[in-house]
Design a protein with these regions (language model features):
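Carbohydrate transferase catalytic cores enriched for Leloir-type hexosyltransferases
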Residues: 1-843
Length: 843
């Protein structure tokens, strides 16, 4: 079976109450026990924060693709009568979205949502072949309608009850509530099924709390002595006024040693309850109102209380007593509704309408040590009963599902019906009869457009924002062009290039870039390019490095992730982190902010295992809390730029320069001239070599970078320039290939790199390599390079001369063993980790 679960009960204000906990826990249990069945969670995109938290909560339980989000961009709060027609439009939208899932079962854990927010629930607005099951927790508002319902909310509540009657099966949480539903709603008992609530036994259990910690916790809530604890809301059915009156009947000596502590959502009624307490001659400190407490504090309070009490005259189930018993608390409760079947101990119960009886039970549990101990031991045993497990309830639900689901309709027929259903949705909204204004029509259209994706067209979008605006032909942009070209040519995936700017939130198709990439002519961004519509299942890959764009788009990218779009970044290095002295402060700050954005994505793909391990270490050392789904992976680059979008052309003196390079041993440095690449050290080393009369060339192929003005001035004015010293500034890939062919040895003295493309380029041209001994160069070149250490010119000068001796003796390491990928192979590695994670680095 395919089971779709509407998770709105875990997204609204109900999330912090029993409904929310039930929704999440039954969904998790179904996912655990449904071995041959598929569980799909359906979320309302109007609740953005909850979408992210629920995706995180179900990480490792369900695949992310099993979490579907429909979008709602207009107000549907039922408390506002003006929203009535918008609510109907949203109901059509939600039902058709769920119909598209093609589920056998649609489980709605709470139909009574949407009064104060944009939750939307309905049954039967559109035809469906799915069976719809709902959960009704209690009928307290109906049973006590004079106290709990007013005319405004009453009509809405009755509409929701009518929806419940349309369910193919109704679940509830106790046999008591089942009787109420059958008798009051006139529903056959055979259509109503009991799913007991359960608790997290890893959270609610007896614990030993050191005196210091217990004192600190109790002081936090102004609890100064033993205390009688209540947990829950302040609804009328909770019977809190009678509890206060009963507490006031205790002797002063008992009250002196015990406070009455209200834990949870009672703050709204605190003033009224304190007024009552004053009339009952209670002191201010006799009553404590904690408000909502953390998931850590609640079990601790259960463990520390003298006793727990639930005086309700009506409960659908009664989770707090079960939690308290599991923590070893002595529990006393009302003998009304579901509580006798939950607690199952007549001696612990009292008449909720009899204040004297309530006071008597409180007095006994506080003063009778044996009675209290018996209740504690009994409660521990009762809370462990098999029926109070989520797995048991989930298996019960599955059995019910199997009895009401007919033979599965073929997938082909299902898809055909879905297409018709979407047409019906588009026809149904105008037929509501509302005169929607232009803004409302736009928001309805936007909601439909973002909720329903074209089928079978998951796409890979590659961000090329930097080269779409201006291609500086940096190493990263060379990689971007080469990888993008290969992925565009891959027939197994649908790939598009996209761009944006820091001032525009949306992304646009980079049509001009894509169209001209094969000719290596990168067009400037065309503002008439088509706006990208992202859908569930799409991937957005930031292949280019554009920190400002990622930072300004952080919020928008989280919205995309909420909708099921996966966002990944390629990380080339962490140089600004490790060598801040070589970067302007603003750039380093921006890079750190960019890393923060990266860690909130779905993953980082590094261009070497060294960088991947470095990124993981950075995350740990800086106590960064990445997104739940975040993973670090790595792939290797190619260096064959001539086979993939190379830049072309020669400078006028190229022939002469190449002749000079070929005339004597030439040592080549390739890359942008930056401080950490150690050009200054290398030039000083060659000045020592030339001073010894050694006839050798030093050639630099690379553009001027930042913080190198003094070096560039020296380079331009150097007496050996044009004789033994050459600077080839911004030459094409085609020209660089010829320079490699004319050179003897590659020198790579950089203090750090993300990969080291020149190493692989040199190997392709069978050039020997002298490289600094750093981890990434060992990863790329292994034993196929001559390594050196030291930051002084003498260290490199000595290494060059040692290598020259080895070369004369025929013992210099050969670079020919360095693995060399094609760009197609490099792109294939990236594609594999995009779609099939393998050797992930642990964070």
């Amino acid at each position: 079976m395919r089971i779709a679960i509407d998770m709105q009960g875990a997204q609204t204000l109900s999330a912090k109450r029993g409904v929310g906990r039930f929704t999440v826990n039954i969904a998790k249990a179904l996912a655990r026990v449904a071995e041959e069945d598929e569980i799909i969670l359906v979320l309302n995109g109007a609740f953005e924060a909850s979408v992210r938290s629920l995706r995180d909560d179900f990480h490792g339980i369900l695949p992310q693709e099993n979490i579907k989000v429909w979008q709602l961009h207009f107000d549907t709060k039922a408390i506002d009568p003006a929203n009535r027609n918008l609510i109907k439009a949203a109901e059509y939208l939600r039902e058709e979205f769920i119909n598209q899932i093609d589920a056998d079962i649609i489980l709605v854990p709470n139909l009574q949502e949407g009064w104060l927010d944009s939750a939307v629930t309905s049954i039967g607005r559109l035809p469906t072949k799915s069976k719809v099951c709902s959960i009704l927790y209690d009928l307290a508002p109906l049973i006590y309608k004079e106290e709990l319902l007013n005319n405004i909310i009453g009509n809405w509540y009755y509409e929701k009850l009518d929806l419940t009657k349309r369910s193919d099966a109704i679940f509830t949480v106790s046999w008591s509530t089942k009787r109420d539903i059958s008798e009051l709603l006139h529903i056959p008992k055979e259509n109503i099924f009991v799913l007991y609530c359960a608790i997290d036994r890893n959270q609610f259990k007896p614990i030993t709390i050191p005196d210091g910690e217990s004192y600190q916790l109790l002081s936090k809530y102004s609890i100064k002595q033993g205390f009688l604890m209540y947990a829950g809301g302040a609804d009328k059915n909770k019977n809190l006024p009678r509890l206060i009156e009963a507490f006031s009947l205790l002797s002063p000596s008992l009250r002196k040693d015990h406070q009455l502590v209200f834990v949870g959502g009672c703050l709204s009624e605190e003033t009224n309850l304190r007024d009552l307490a004053m009339k009952c001659n209670l002191e201010y400190n006799d009553l404590i109102f904690t408000g909502h407490v953390s998931d850590q504090d609640l079990p601790a309070l259960y463990n520390l209380c003298s006793a727990f009490i639930l005086p309700s005259f009506h409960e659908g189930f009664g989770i707090p007593p079960l939690e308290a018993m599991a923590c070893g608390a002595a529990v006393i409760a009302s003998n009304a509704a579901s509580l006798p079947e939950v607690i199952d101990c007549p001696d612990a119960l009292f008449d909720p309408y009899d204040i004297t009886a309530i006071a008597g039970k409180i007095r006994r549990v506080i003063s009778d040590e044996q009675f209290r101990s018996d209740l504690q031991q009994y409660g521990l045993k009762r809370s462990q009963a098999k029926e109070f497990t989520w797995e048991n309830s989930a298996r019960t639900a599955l059995e019910v599902f199997k009895t009401i689901v007919p033979e599965r309709i073929s997938a082909a027929n299902g898809k055909e019906e879905q297409t018709v259903g979407l047409d019906k949705l588009l026809q149904a909204i105008p037929s509501i009869g509302a005169q929607f204004n232009d803004e409302e029509l736009f928001k309805i259209a936007l909601s439909i457009g973002e909720s329903f994706r074209p089928r079978n067209c998951e796409k890979l979008y590659i961000d090329v924002s930097s080269i779409a605006v201006q291609d500086h032909a940096t190493g990263i942009q060379r990689v971007t062009r080469a990888i993008a070209l290969q992925l565009l040519a891959d027939q197994e995936i649908t790939c598009n290039l996209v761009y944006s700017t820091p001032t525009i939130e949306s992304f646009y198709l980079a049509d001009n870039v894509e169209a001209r990439l094969n000719n290596t002519i990168i067009a400037k961004a065309d503002r008439n390019d088509q706006l990208v519509e992202f859908y569930d299942g799409d991937i957005l890959l930031f292949l280019d490095l554009h920190p400002a764009l990622a930072i300004t788009h952080a919020s928008y990218l989280q919205k995309l992730r909420n909708r099921g779009v996966r966002v990944f970044y390629v990380v080339y290095d962490l140089l600004p982190v490790h060598f801040p002295q070589y970067f302007v402060p603003l750039l380093r700050t921006e890079f750190i902010e960019w890393l923060d954005v990266v860690f909130q994505s779905d993953g980082a793909f590094c261009i070497s295992k060294t960088v991947a391990e470095d990124l993981s270490r950075y995350c740990r050392e800086n106590a960064i809390n990445p997104s739940t789904n975040f993973r670090i992976d790595w792939f290797h680059l190619s260096a064959d730029f001539m086979s993939s979008a190379p830049s072309l052309g020669f400078l006028p003196d190229a022939k002469h320069v190449l002749s000079l390079l070929s005339s004597r041993p030439t040592f080549l440095m390739v890359g942008t001239i930056e401080p950490r690449k150690r050009h200054a050290q290398t030039l000083a080393a060659f000045e020592q070599i030339w001073a010894k009369g050694i006839d050798a060339n030093f050639c630099i192929a690379g553009r001027q970078g930042w913080l190198m003005e003094d070096f560039i001035e020296k380079l331009r004015a150097h007496p050996e320039r044009g004789r033994h010293l050459f600077w080839l500034n911004g030459i094409s890939d085609e020209y660089l290939e010829k320079v490699y062919d004319a050179s003897t040895c590659l020198i790579v003295p950089s203090e750090d790199e993300g990969f080291g493309l020149p190493l692989v380029e040199a190997a392709r041209h069978k050039l020997s390599i002298i490289a600094r001994d750093i981890p990434v160069f060992r990863e790329v070149a292994s034993g196929h390079a001559f390594y050196f250490n030291g930051l002084e010119p003498e260290a490199l000068s000595s290494a060059i001369q040692d290598w020259m001796k080895l070369r004369e003796e025929g013992r210099a390491p050969s670079s020919e063993g360095i693995p060399s990928l094609t760009w197609k192979e490099s792109a294939a590695q990236l594609k594999q980790i995009l779609f099939r994670p393998h050797d992930c680095v642990k964070v």
